[in-house]
Amino acid sequence: MTTTLTRPADGEGSVQVQQDASVRIQEGALVIAVYGKGGIGKSTTSSNLSAAFSKLGKRVLQIGCDPKHDSTFTLTHRMVPTVIDILEEVDFHSEELRPDDFMFEGFNGVKCVESGGPPAGTGCGGYVTGQTVKLLKEHHLLEDTDVVIFDVLGDVVCGGFAAPLQHANYCLIVTANDFDSIFAMNRIVAAINAKAKNYKVRLGGVIANRSADLDQIEKFNKETGLKTMAHFKNVDAIRRSRLKKCTIFEMDSSEEGVLECQNEYLALAQKMIDKVEPLEAEPLKDREIFDLLGFD
């Protein structure tokens, strides 16, 4: 006897964490999920982009979705407690919490939340992200927000860490001009396309980071239908801003590369505000990427 198991559809061949209506962000706010290969600079990019939106007069909330909870420290100038840690302190009775227990104000008024995550090898990071959004809604903290940025762990595209895609309008992918970063980006494109079948999320574009050139990125973009939205070269001031625990907007603009980076972040934020045209990109097969990238 053969038993056929049917799985809830959420893109072809995928089983994903489903978010109920109570944890979805209301229409009106611009919601961006930032993905990319681990260590590529997503937190740096997210924090500086949040700062740029705030400079343009927007009310911004950044949600770090990594158990390392290091997404927002350049905005807050410290490591803030995570939502999961705070909930554990009150035995998960969220009604006992006040907003300032888990949400912290950073540079130029940016609101910062670190969702945290379960111990390594246990639990589901997507569930934690969903509970974070639910908590924010319970305390009416999303009602006066113009922009929400999810800074997502590594290039994990399982059901759990794909959860932010269920809230987002756009996904931005951070990459470098190298094989490994672009290979990871290709997998992320596939995950976003799967989510886009049932959710509003669409590809917003590529952020080239720590890259002097764009030749390999542009090769990939041409084949898949992606587009580079911003380009940040390997500017030492960005590295030093992390060590100083501050955003690029708090660095001396007379230093080499600082003003250029600030302007590029402001330009990227303005592009997103002006309603980016969603991209219809198609991922390549692994062998196709292998054959595509490299020098002739």
UniProtKB/Swiss-Prot annotation:
GO annotation, biological process: light-independent chlorophyll biosynthetic process; photosynthesis, dark reaction
Subunit structure: Homodimer. Protochlorophyllide reductase is composed of three subunits; ChlL, ChlN and ChlB.
One example GO MF annotation: oxidoreductase activity, acting on the CH-CH group of donors, iron-sulfur protein as acceptor
Residues reported in the UniProt entry to bind Mg(2+): 43
Cofactor annotation comment: Binds 1 [4Fe-4S] cluster per dimer.
Iron-sulfur is among the record's keywords: yes
Source species: Prochlorococcus marinus (strain MIT 9303)
Catalytic activity: chlorophyllide a + oxidized 2[4Fe-4S]-[ferredoxin] + 2 ADP + 2 phosphate = protochlorophyllide a + reduced 2[4Fe-4S]-[ferredoxin] + 2 ATP + 2 H2O
Enzyme class: oxidoreductase
Protein name (record): Light-independent protochlorophyllide reductase iron-sulfur ATP-binding protein
